[in-house]
Amino acid sequence: MRAVVQRVSFSEVRVEGKLRGRIKQGLMVLLGIKKGDSKAEGDYLLEKIVNLRIFPDEEGKMNRSLLDIEGEILLVSQFTLYGDARKGRRPSFSAAELPELAEALFDYCVDGLRQRGVQVETGTFGAEMLLSIENDGPCTILLDSEKLF
């Protein structure tokens, strides 16, 4: 499982021109699920995400977590995080989980964040979406449950 975590002061997602989710201060998280991922990978990433100390403290140092600032998360599924462009010009997405299995794991992650006390907004799984992101910093962190980076 992979996540692109962006510290934002504002983010929203629209589906077919209609607002689907909007947050203020918090994290915009793009989540990719690969074949074979399980709840264990989800739990690992969720703990990382909510506890990442990437928000500034009183001295301006990145020392506070999403939980510390009581921030929100906009969580959007993105299978293209498992795109492999090493050969040719068209990426292969064969490492991405099948949609029906990925959706169940995505829903598990949404519930897991809410159980951790986080306000969560989402896009629509499998839909074409338009994201607006006001990246604060900018601050973008890449996470991988296999600890590849």
UniProtKB/Swiss-Prot annotation:
GO terms for cellular component: cytoplasm. InterPro entries: Daa-tRNA_deacyls_DTD (IPR003732), DTD-like_sf (IPR023509). It is found in: Cytoplasm. Belongs to the DTD family. Its EC number is 3.1.1.96. An aminoacyl-tRNA editing enzyme that deacylates mischarged D-aminoacyl-tRNAs. Also deacylates mischarged glycyl-tRNA(Ala), protecting cells against glycine mischarging by AlaRS. Acts via tRNA-based rather than protein-based catalysis; rejects L-amino acids rather than detecting D-amino acids in the active site. By recycling D-aminoacyl-tRNA to D-amino acids and free tRNA molecules, this enzyme counteracts the toxicity associated with the formation of D-aminoacyl-tRNA entities in vivo and helps enforce protein L-homochirality. This is D-aminoacyl-tRNA deacylase. Homodimer. GO terms for molecular function: D-tyrosyl-tRNA(Tyr) deacylase activity; Gly-tRNA(Ala) deacylase activity; Ser(Gly)-tRNA(Ala) hydrolase activity; tRNA binding. HAMAP family: Deacylase_Dtd. It holds the Pfam family Tyr_Deacylase. GO terms for biological process: D-amino acid catabolic process. The gene is dtd. A Gly-cisPro motif from one monomer fits into the active site of the other monomer to allow specific chiral rejection of L-amino acids. The keyword Hydrolase applies. PANTHER family: D-AMINOACYL-TRNA DEACYLASE 1, D-TYROSYL-TRNA TYR DEACYLASE. A motif (Gly-cisPro motif, important for rejection of L-amino acids) lies at residues 137-138. It catalyses: glycyl-tRNA(Ala) + H2O = tRNA(Ala) + glycine + H(+); a D-aminoacyl-tRNA + H2O = a tRNA + a D-alpha-amino acid + H(+). It comes from Syntrophomonas wolfei subsp. wolfei (strain DSM 2245B / Goettingen). It comes from the Bacteria. Keywords: Cytoplasm, Hydrolase, RNA-binding, tRNA-binding.
